[in-house]
Amino acid sequence: MSHKHLHSIHVNHYKHTAGCATEVMPIPDVVKISMSQHIGAPCKPLVQKGDYVKVGQLLGDVDAFVSAPIHSSVSGTVTGIEEQRSAVGGVDTLVVIETDKKQEIYEEIKPPVVEDLPGFIKAVRDSGLVGLGGASFPTHIKFNPKNIDDVHTLIVNAAECEPFITSDHRLMLEDTEDLISGMQLAMKYIGLDEGFIGIEENKPDAIAHIDKVLADKGITNIKTFKLQARYPKGAERVLVYEITGKTMNAGVLPADLGVILSNVTTFAKVGEYFRTGMPLVSKRMTVDGDAVAQPKNVIAPIGAMI
């Protein structure tokens, strides 16, 4: 794009784990799964003490517009429903599960079959997907804006401008097929013309890899977009401007500018859900910092405790 760049700053990068393949975290003895993992109304537990649950089984839901269902990340026995103080000062309801380490898959897990936009939106809600870049806004709502007929562009936020984190970087190298599939599904059912993956220039291997996969598949309506490695290129307003040249003033949403935008992990999870039927039960994350002897990226079950 020919427009000027918005003001940003250079921060030192400590991407120690960029070259490390993702590891799968061992299943812990106990998980505590919050019923408030999203913006909006918290879920109500649908299980009780003594119930045996399996991976992917529905644990909580609520009949509210802004919410998302929550599923079990492990197989094991529910040992209690607890309440604890949340990070923002409220009260969280937790489903506590003693794991059996078997990771038995819930029998009803199967890839969804959809034929139209309402079916797609329902499937995305059933998956429990929320924005996985930090905001945790329910994805099925973001994919169905009021002015959906005016939306034409998909933007994937893969900037990952934080100094230490490399989990999105590893996802782009390791889960490329799910990422592209998730984008194609969203574009097909929402009716979007073009898609962009915004990636900072300090990830040349991810850019080259995705470009090759797109070329090999003959996909021409999805492109990578190289961003400066400056902070905060991953901020919503900055990313929309960098890719489209359109300014998001106060009170303006991406959809108001014809854009649907979400994190790269979210789209990869869309692809994974439609491929396997497994809802959101795990998250890839970077473990790094001065107190960490062996920095790495791990896939951890939701509810695992530090």
Segments (PLM) and residue ranges:
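Short histidine-centered loop motifs in beta-beta connectors
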Residues: C43-Y52, G56
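Short hydrophobic beta/alpha edge segments that flank linear recognition/processing sites
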Residues: V53-S67, E82, T93-T99
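Conserved hydrophobic positions within beta-strands
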Residues: G76-V78
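Acidic low-complexity segments
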Residues: G80, R85-F137, I148, P204, ...
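Gly-rich Lys/Arg/Thr-decorated short loops/hinges at beta-loop-alpha junctions or inter-strand turns
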Residues: G131, L154-D168, A291
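Histidine-anchored nucleotide/phosphate-binding helix
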Residues: L173-Y189
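Hydrophobic alpha-helical positions that pack around
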Residues: D193-M305
